[in-house]
Regions:
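HTH-adjacent hinge/linker in prokaryotic transcriptional regulators
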Residues: 3-10, 14-98
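Amphipathic alpha-helical interaction segments
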Residues: 15, 41, 101-104, 122, ...
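Glycine-rich phosphate-binding loops that contact phosphosugars or nucleotide phosphates
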Residues: 104-224, 228-237
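A short, charged, Gly/Pro-tolerant segment at domain boundaries
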Residues: 239-259
Length: 259
C-alpha cells in the first residue's frame, strides 16, 4: 500500500487485495489493526492525497529555465526524443486492440459524448471536429455558460463517452465519468494510467505517455491516439460517411470557410 498509494485511493478493497495477492479478509484485519473502522476510512487519506497533489508547474518551469541557460541544444534534443517516445508508446502494438475495440464501441453508439477539460480540451476538440465531418452523433462537453450537466442529460446505455484526462485530473471530468457510468454508458478513457480516476469505469483504457522535459506535460501522445481513433472510425463508418463528408465540403465551400 505504501508503494502503490494511487491504487489504494482509487480501487475497492477487493481489487487492492487481488493486486496484493492476499484475501480481502487480510485487508480487513489490517484496517482494524491500523485503527480504522472500515476500509473506506483507511482509503480516505490516500484519496485526499490524490485530490490535493500539486502539479508543481512552477518548480518545473524554474528547472527548464536553469537548463536552457546552460544548454539549450541539449534541452531541445531531450524534448524531441521524449515527444517521439510519447507517440511510439501511444501507438504501440499493445494499445492497438484497445483502440480498435474503443472505435467499435463508438461506432455502435447512438451518441458519442466527448470530454476533455483544461489542457485536455485540445485533443478532445480535435476528435469532435474530425468526427463530426463524417458522423452526426457527436456531443462535445464543456463548461461554458454552466451547461455541463445539461449536456450530459439523456446519456444512457446506448451511448458512449470518450474521456481524455491526465493528472492533475479536472474535477468536472471525474464527475462526468461517474455520472455516465451510473447511467450505463460505455466509457473509453485516454489517460496516463490504468489507475487513473478517469478510467475507473472504462470499458477500454488507452494509456498514453505525457512526459516532457518542459514545464507542462505533453499532449502529443493523446493527439496521436485521437488521430488513430478517427482513422479506425472512418474504416468502420460505411458508405454514408462519404456522403456526409461531401455535403460538409460543399457547405464549407458555399460559406467560403477557407482562403
Amino acid at each position: 500500500m505504501a508503494e502503490h498509494p494511487e491504487e489504494v485511493g482509487l480501487n475497492s478493497m477487493r481489487r487492492v487485495a487481488q493486486d496484493a495477492g492476499v484475501k480481502p479478509a487480510t485487508i480487513t484485519r489490517l484496517t482494524k489493526i491500523l485503527g480504522f473502522p472500515q476500509y473506506d476510512a483507511l482509503r480516505e487519506p490516500f484519496r485526499q492525497r490524490l485530490r490535493t497533489r500539486s502539479p508543481e508547474f512552477a518548480s518545473k518551469l524554474q528547472h527548464v529555465q536553469n537548463l536552457s541557460e546552460s544548454d539549450e541544444d541539449s534541452l531541445f534534443a531531450d524534448l524531441r526524443a521524449q515527444e517521439i517516445s510519447n507517440v511510439q508508446h501511444s501507438l504501440s502494438d499493445e494499445n492497438y486492440p484497445h483502440m480498435d475495440a474503443a472505435a467499435q464501441i463508438m461506432n455502435d453508439s447512438r451518441r458519442v459524448y466527448v470530454l476533455g477539460l483544461r489542457g485536455a480540451y485540445a485533443p478532445a476538440f480535435l476528435f469532435h471536429y474530425a468526427y463530426q465531418l463524417f458522423q452526426d452523433n457527436s456531443q462535445l462537453l464543456d463548461t461554458r455558460a454552466g451547461m455541463f450537466a445539461d449536456q450530459l442529460r439523456g446519456i444512457g446505455p446506448e451511448d458512449s463517452l470518450l474521456v481524455i484526462s491526465f493528472s492533475p485530473y479536472a474535477q468536472h471530468t471525474i464527475d462526468a465519468v461517474e455520472y455516465a457510468a451510473e447511467a450505463g454508458a460505455k466509457i473509453v478513457a485516454v489517460t496516463d494510467s490504468i489507475v487513473s480516476p478517469a478510467a475507473s469505469a472504462a470499458a477500454h483504457t488507452i494509456v498514453t505517455k505525457n512526459q516532457s522535459p518542459s514545464f507542462y506535460h505533453s499532449f502529443t501522445g493523446a493527439l496521436a491516439v485521437v488521430q488513430a481513433l478517427i482513422t479506425l472510425l472512418v474504416t468502420k463508418a460505411g458508405g454514408d460517411a462519404v456522403k456526409i463528408v461531401e455535403e460538409a465540403e460543399k457547405q464549407l465551400s458555399r460559406i467560403s470557410a477557407y482562403w
